[in-house]
Amino acid sequence: MKAQKYSKEGKLISEIELPSALFESKLSVASIYEAIKAENANLRSGNHATKTRSMVSGGGKKPWSQKGTGRARQGSTRAPHWVGGGTVHGPQKRDYSYKVSSKLKHRAVLSILGKKAQASAVKVVEDLDPKEYNTKAFDSIFKNMNLKNTGVIGLLVQGENDFLKKSVRNIPTVKYINSKRISCRDILYNRNLVITEAALKEMLVQYGAQK
């Protein structure tokens, strides 16, 4: 599997061979589905909550006598059919998160990388190590790579780089991805995946031995 390699300025240098251990794994749609579903579930706060009739304040007194009024019998003003009453079968706080095995996560990551490579959506760039905040420079890099206005760009770099992270944060279509904390959502939900050389080497160590 081949990919285009670019300089720090975004100029095309050559075409390189991508590591087969990372980009030629068998596609596992089921693994991608389970990994994405788990990540989506883990993002949910689960803070939704309604009050049942036992939680609503008031309503302890019977509103009127059982007999003799001519009206329907009522036991509480907080019954569900009353205005201001409790909710029946409403949502309660809950934890939606769940875990998937590390083996499944590895398989999902490799499947996504392989799918991206087949679609020619993987680009390799020389290591980016800015010494100052400069959004304009990175906007120019993506423009030179002909990626501007092509959709979301996933920029996969090694570790945390504050200058780099905050510089690209001002570009709406660029998603900063730390190679030490890769999520399937980050590498899947983009049009192009730009990987630095250092990040590629680190991924090879982390995911290359897994199948």
Swiss-Prot record:
Keywords: Ribonucleoprotein, Ribosomal protein, RNA-binding, rRNA-binding
Ranges annotated as biased composition (Polar residues): 46-55
Pfam families found in the cross-reference section: Ribosomal_L4 (PF00573)
SUPFAM superfamilies membership: Ribosomal protein L4
Keyword Ribosomal protein applies: yes
One term under GO cellular component: ribonucleoprotein complex
Keyword set includes Repeat: no
Protein task: One of the primary rRNA binding proteins, this protein initially binds near the 5'-end of the 23S rRNA. It is important during the early stages of 50S assembly. It makes multiple contacts with different domains of the 23S rRNA in the assembled 50S subunit and ribosome. Forms part of the polypeptide exit tunnel.
PANTHER family recorded: 50S RIBOSOMAL PROTEIN L4, LARGE RIBOSOMAL SUBUNIT PROTEIN UL4M
Protein name per UniProt: Large ribosomal subunit protein uL4
Source organism phylogeny: Bacteria, Pseudomonadati, Spirochaetota, Spirochaetia, Leptospirales
Gene (UniProt): rplD
